[in-house]
Amino acid sequence: MDPSDFPSPFDPLTLPEKPLAGDLPVDMEFGEDLLESQTAPTRGWAPPGPSPSSGALDLLDTPAGLEKDPGVLDGATELLGLGGLLYKAPSPPEVDHGPEGTLAWDAGDQTLEPGPGGQTPEVVPPDPGAGANSCSPEGLLEPLAPDSPITLQSPHIEEEETTSIATARRGSPGQEEELPQGQPQSPNAPPSPSVGETLGDGINSSQTKPGGSSPPAHPSLPGDGLTAKASEKPPERKRSERVRRAEPPKPEVVDSTESIPVSDEDSDAMVDDPNDEDFVPFRPRRSPRMSLRSSVSQRAGRSAVGTKMTCAHCRTPLQKGQTAYQRKGLPQLFCSSSCLTTFSKKPSGKKTCTFCKKEIWNTKDSVVAQTGSGGSFHEFCTSVCLSLYEAQQQRPIPQSGDPADATRCSICQKTGEVLHEVSNGSVVHRLCSDSCFSKFRANKGLKTNCCDQCGAYIYTKTGSPGPELLFHEGQQKRFCNTTCLGAYKKKNTRVYPCVWCKTLCKNFEMLSHVDRNGKTSLFCSLCCTTSYKVKQAGLTGPPRPCSFCRRSLSDPCYYNKVDRTVYQFCSPSCWTKFQRTSPEGGIHLSCHYCHSLFSGKPEVLDWQDQVFQFCCRDCCEDFKRLRGVVSQCEHCRQEKLLHEKLRFSGVEKSFCSEGCVLLYKQDFTKKLGLCCITCTYCSQTCQRGVTEQLDGSTWDFCSEDCKSKYLLWYCKAARCHACKRQGKLLETIHWRGQIRHFCNQQCLLRFYSQQNQPNLDTQSGPESLLNSQSPESKPQTPSQTKVENSNTVRTPEENGNLGKIPVKTRSAPTAPTPPPPPPPATPRKNKAAMCKPLMQNRGVSCKVEMKSKGSQTEEWKPQVIVLPIPVPIFVPVPMHLYCQKVPVPFSMPIPVPVPMFLPTTLESTDKIVETIEELKVKIPSNPLEADILAMAEMIAEAEELDKASSDLCDLVSNQSAEGLLEDCDLFGPARDDVLAMAVKMANVLDEPGQDLEADFPKNPLDINPSVDFLFDCGLVGPEDVSTEQDLPRTMRKGQKRLVLSESCSRDSMSSQPSCTGLNYSYGVNAWKCWVQSKYANGETSKGDELRFGPKPMRIKEDILACSAAELNYGLAQFVREITRPNGERYEPDSIYYLCLGIQQYLLENNRMVNIFTDLYYLTFVQELNKSLSTWQPTLLPNNTVFSRVEEEHLWECKQLGVYSPFVLLNTLMFFNTKFFGLQTAEEHMQLSFTNVVRQSRKCTTPRGTTKVVSIRYYAPVRQRKGRDTGPGKRKREDEAPILEQRENRMNPLRCPVKFYEFYLSKCPESLRTRNDVFYLQPERSCIAESPLWYSVIPMDRSMLESMLNRILAVREIYEELGRPGEEDLD
């Protein structure tokens, strides 16, 4: 739909935006009976009637118009006098109050009101029992008879205010429509409409039955002397067109037929306020506390239909005898206690008065009463509004004479005010609301100009900016304002990687490119887009240095193509800098989309008075999509991307595709017939103007101008628009509606390159051409304009577009006045007069010549450092020898390097050089390797010094080795790294007969001599180092020897190797030996060979060459059959150590698998679990537990951490076992999200108050009862240590609190309050970037037992359990 399809008087912009005061209540629909108000002459409503069409709408200017159409003002009307202005207030329509058409009786007024039939029915006396309440409000408000002595006093109007006349139209304050010229204005006509008023604004005719008569008019204000005759029926006005009450009367007399428009603000301000001075209480007010019974009896007396009581919440009718519920102090009734409770919990929104529609600010003065035909409760701001609303509801509405005149909505079939008129084909649909308008568009499948965010209709105003456009997902989106555009972008923003450089960007900040296959790709910049296009074209070639900085290319590299030459760049900055300079000589243009340089004929786009140049058609199409180059196609009338602009009969038209161009040409040719031609010169399709015969061919032209210009070009007499030379012009282009000719492509490129920098001295560039006016575009004089406007003729096509363009007069093109003929030339015989001088213009084009010069930014010469060499000399200083108080020199020893020259011979010099060379060979360049070699030499020398003792304590006691130990700093912070490097240097994978249990025995005295120095260095454990660090700083100096001697004086069996690192060579060599021994005797028997399905499986010696299935079944067989070189069976912890080594070997060789958690290795995991389930830790004589598996081994082979959901679960179970002491699956299954909580507290330390974060576990009550039995149980429960895991501030990567918080973030939020689950099964298809890693299904018992058996084989588990509980810091 387009706004131009609406008739001018029913433009959607001119309709009211909000309901007027006294219109439909908020909770009442169109289907209910609506009663008008007759309380005061200051109010009037227009009954809903059929909205007139633009053609049938006439403005009633004079009473003569009323005589021609007397039915316009038929019906019961009422003349209201306000300030000297007389206008008609229409009577409300009738309401059927029964078959007899009863009348309302008023004791204060003897006037009878006729019923629907036009006859006066029988008078019904009032009910004497009603008391004061029996006085009906109608009587005081009915029109008075001419002979009635009772008159109504008009409200007082202040004199110092002025009358303001405005319109009450919706949302169109800026629109204005002028009256046609030449139409005289009647002296009795209404004043000129204000801005925003259109013809027919607010004029509705209400017709009644022919038999109805109109009551006489009330007199005007006293002193005016203006009375209206009963026969004169002024045109009715809506309630929204009243005059403001507080306005003084106009001095002049205004005819009663004048239309007085009143603004919406005036109508809102005219509600009666009891605080005003001129307020008159027209009738006694009914108390809002009136009982329901008296209220029902009064309404029953007025209407034959009884009122039904309904529930205030669910609107269910209450039956007679049913129990009703009511809250104290509130009048609402409810059918059940649930409705009462639900209604009370409703949020209290902004309440508005049912009558005046104003917000109720003071709830104390508000009145809630059950009134109206439906018997529902309504809230009013004051009792005055309640009385006025009851009077409005009690007055009968006369029925319209013709029910077909009522305007009904085409969607909901309700009668009411028309908000939209839609012309679909030949049918005009009238719609009452925006929701019906939306349903109509959805039912008809119409694509109207609506906002894609909020769905509101976008009204196109003249001179106002159009809608906000956005090209998204291949569609053009429209938005009514920038707020909706921002909300749409925020809602649909996604982050995508650039196809070329993989940079993450937001989709609305990226550039889209559609390839030949229709696939859309997103890029972060034009550099990446151009590089992708060059790569797709297959023009990259071999890698070369960067075309700008000559550096080697990095990945990814960037490309650009200029004149069949592909340039390569190392970075986007080089790509951009290269575009600023021309790679070669000649003229190059820059593409407006990809900013690449090219020297071919450009693709040109003329859009919004700007001309854009592109290197190819693809860039032009991408630019259209990016910038939203959208126009309405002249053929299909749809807004799509602009394809081409063509001229038809001098008018430029836009098209969306080539098919629409051909179809429009076909229709245009049929319309013009045989006279339709295509101009040979300007190529426009128009009517034949001139025909010319050239070389036996017939050429058609649209005008003489085109013919003359074509003949100049054909005869080679035209000049080039670039170099101004005559001759053969090969290039022709269309430039802003004109034809330009050029000598060759070089001149054409020069013309395009100077479009933004024209040289006005030598040639007329594009900008200068715009400044030069053609003879047709000269401004006309006012006299010519006036004459031409009187003869203006509009075509039907122009009349159809009046809604789209501003309303203004268009003058028909007239032929310019021919100039006077020049005087005849005087004939001359002089031959010199026949000579024509040859004029030539020389154009000077300045071009900046770019030079490149290399500069060195890095230092390439070695920096010369001046090293001062101090030489001691004796300088005599005179002194006073302490006889006077003068500064005395003070000697301070300063270490100064002084070169010493020792005398030597030639033989000793040669030996010194040889010694230096030997030291260079022995000492490696890596200092870490040098420390290891020094350590090995130190141990070797120690063994030679003392053959009897191999203990490290004897070595330390030796004074010669003490200095070497201190220099190596074996016991410093880098001790662990040095030992790990030493172990890895000793890893020899091809070493035969490597025995793990022989190298790592339970008894430290049986250490293998090949690795004994490694374990000797481990005699001082981390506990001893921590004890040393806890000592004061003054005592630590020189304590290294003391601590070492104390540790050596202990029993040699009190310690075992610690933190030796995982050596994967044991596992790999054991695998090779097992495979070799398995296939040593040839092929194995069929019963012993491994099978994967029907095919036999042969295990390979190289673990990396094995597939997942081979590794699974091979490891399972390896766990069952592996033995030591001496034939004995490995212990379970040793087998676990070998498997951890195999896992580390796979990871270090980029085989990213986890043989302990992946589902492919389930058979191996089950077999390993069988082996570990029977293992029990060995207790050494010093009451320590021995195990070859350490915690550090699990961190090295990535069995602890956050590498996968299973690894994270294994880490949590490891910490819970280590710190909580949970050693069975039942104890782990008692964990839940409610009894494992994160807490933070403040504790006091010698350094001050710090915040400590920990994880606490509150064991269930039944577990405590099972452990604590007998007397004193309560005391033991209170004194039981709290199980907690404290944060690791020294190493946050191994902090239990961090792992627990990360686990909670990956669990479903709905399970964080469960008290029966803690370990959850991971999702089957989840990646590291997934927001959730775990499902709602808990881990089964078998999987927990398998993980727990592997954890219980770690030595640190039992060391932590053997430590005494630390005191709580609370």
UniProtKB/Swiss-Prot annotation:
Q: Which GO terms describe its biological process?
A: cytoskeleton organization; regulation of cell morphogenesis
Positions with biased composition (Pro residues)? 815-826
- Compartments (UniProt record): Nucleus
- Cross-link Glycyl lysine isopeptide (Lys-Gly) (interchain with G-Cter in SUMO2): which residues? 308, 320, 328, 778, 786, 804, 847, 861, 920, 1275
User: What terms describe the molecular function in GO for this protein?
Assistant: DNA binding; zinc ion binding
Compositional bias of kind Basic and acidic residues = 230-253
Q: In which tissues is it expressed?
A: Most abundant in brain, moderate in muscle and heart, low in other tissues except placenta.
Q: Where is the composition biased (Acidic residues)?
A: 263-279
What positions are modified (Phosphoserine)? 263, 267, 464
State the source organism's domain of life. Answer: Eukaryota
User: Keywords for this entry?
Assistant: Autism, Autism spectrum disorder, Chromosomal rearrangement, Disease variant, Intellectual disability, Isopeptide bond, Metal-binding, Nucleus, Phosphoprotein, Repeat, Ubl conjugation, Zinc, Zinc-finger
What does the UniProt record report as the effect of altering residue 1124 to Q in this chain? In XLID112; uncertain significance
Which portions of the sequence form the region Disordered?
1-72, 90-301, 759-830
Q: Where are the zinc fingers (MYM-type)?
A: 332-366, 378-422, 429-464, 477-511, 521-559, 567-604, 612-646, 653-692, 699-733
Q: Fetch the SMART domains from UniProt.
A: TRASH (SM00746)
Assembly mode: May be a component of a BHC histone deacetylase complex that contains HDAC1, HDAC2, HMG20B/BRAF35, KDM1A, RCOR1/CoREST, PHF21A/BHC80, ZMYM2, ZNF217, ZMYM3, GSE1 and GTF2I.
Function text? Plays a role in the regulation of cell morphology and cytoskeletal organization.
Disease involvement: Intellectual developmental disorder, X-linked 112: A neurodevelopmental disorder characterized by developmental delay, impaired intellectual development, language and motor delay, autism or autistic traits, and variable dysmorphic features.
Please identify the protein, giving its name as recorded: Zinc finger MYM-type protein 3
Q: What is the native source organism of this protein?
A: Homo sapiens
Q: Which gene encodes it?
A: ZMYM3
